[in-house]
């Protein structure tokens, strides 16, 4: 074994390791499964100045290395989340013609219902194996679902809660980047954010490599993913390995989108991820997911303010969004 495999530096010292045992520790670390970092959001949401600063730095480190983080202590209403999943199952169980009554033409899928097989990942010819419903800002005309009224009511409440939390997390992002804490706040209030209620139907006969959601990066600033109903999400790390993100009802997964990556000149990473079909009996079960995509107002400039400015073009958020919607078949 080459010496590079044994060089763990100060990390092993902090773990109480003796330099003579570094090679043994290196072998142990190599065998441990990779995982997305888990942070306690309560340190920022309820902590003192020192705790908030430390959390902001930890968040920056995670976003720079992985582009993803898992949070506990986020304060979201677990009962509301469970009720939203239950009403989503009722909505997606409706006949197609009833669901199509909630589709709104000409809005690029930004709100309302989008049917199965319409969206695909960038540069992917095959459609994703999913259907979804978007909740948007209340000033848009949101279609009511008369057959499942609790779906509309619960979705709108969860949207508001996730938007408020996302704005707080962007304050931590700003602090970690040495920007004023409220740098993003006014630019995301009333923005084009959406709560996507996703249904991946059973696919027992789909090809082994068929994507529930093909490899892609998110368009927006940050995404908040409420614990999914089943595993399947995988994140591509810097070593080229796919890391599974385990579904946990009490955890929130947060990731960097392309807009934030562009704004930071690549300092924060928008990481490729996908949703894969399970093996065996899992293919015969539905999977539900609740990602919240935090978008700014369309006028927000995404010109890079740090990092590799030459590699990241100057856009407004609106121009960037419209460009990407065309790439994935929603415009």
What are these model-derived regions, one by one?
Residues 8, 19-22:
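Short hydrophobic targeting helices and cationic amphipathic motifs
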């Amino acid at each position: 074994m080459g010496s590079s495999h044994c060089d763990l530096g100060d990390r092993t010292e902090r773990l109480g390791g003796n330099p003579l045992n570094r090679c043994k520790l290196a072998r142990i670390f190599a065998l441990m499964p990779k995982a997305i970092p888990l942070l306690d959001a309560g340190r920022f949401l309820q902590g003192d100045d020192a705790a908030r600063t430390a959390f902001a730095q930890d968040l920056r480190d995670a976003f720079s290395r992985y582009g993803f983080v898992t949070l506990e202590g986020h304060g979201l209403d677990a009962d509301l989340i469970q009720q939203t999943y239950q009403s989503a199952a009722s909505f997606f169980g409706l006949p197609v013609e009833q669901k199509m009554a909630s589709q709104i033409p000409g809005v690029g899928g930004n709100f309302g219902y989008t049917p199965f097989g319409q969206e695909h990942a960038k540069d992917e010819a095959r459609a994703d194996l999913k259907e979804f419903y978007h909740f948007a800002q209340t000033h848009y005309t949101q279609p009511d679902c008369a057959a499942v009224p609790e779906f509309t009511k619960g979705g709108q409440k969860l949207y508001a809660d996730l938007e408020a939390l996302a704005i707080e997390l962007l304050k931590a992002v700003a602090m970690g980047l040495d920007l004023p804490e409220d740098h993003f706040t006014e630019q995301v209030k009333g923005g084009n954010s959406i709560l996507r209620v996703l249904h991946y139907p059973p696919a027992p006969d789909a090809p082994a490599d068929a994507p529930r959601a093909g490899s892609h990066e998110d368009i927006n600033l940050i995404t908040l993913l409420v614990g999914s109903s089943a595993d399947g999400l995988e994140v591509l790390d810097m070593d080229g390995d796919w890391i599974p993100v385990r579904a946990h009802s009490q955890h929130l997964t947060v990731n960097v989108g392309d807009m934030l990556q562009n704004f930071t000149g690549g300092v924060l990473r928008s990481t490729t991820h996908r949703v894969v079909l399970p093996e065996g009996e899992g293919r015969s079960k539905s999977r539900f997911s609740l990602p919240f995509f935090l978008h700014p107002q369309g006028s927000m400039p995404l010109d890079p303010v740090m990092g590799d400015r030459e590699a990241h073009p100057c856009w407004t958020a609106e121009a960037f969004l419209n460009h990407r919607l065309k790439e994935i078949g929603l415009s």
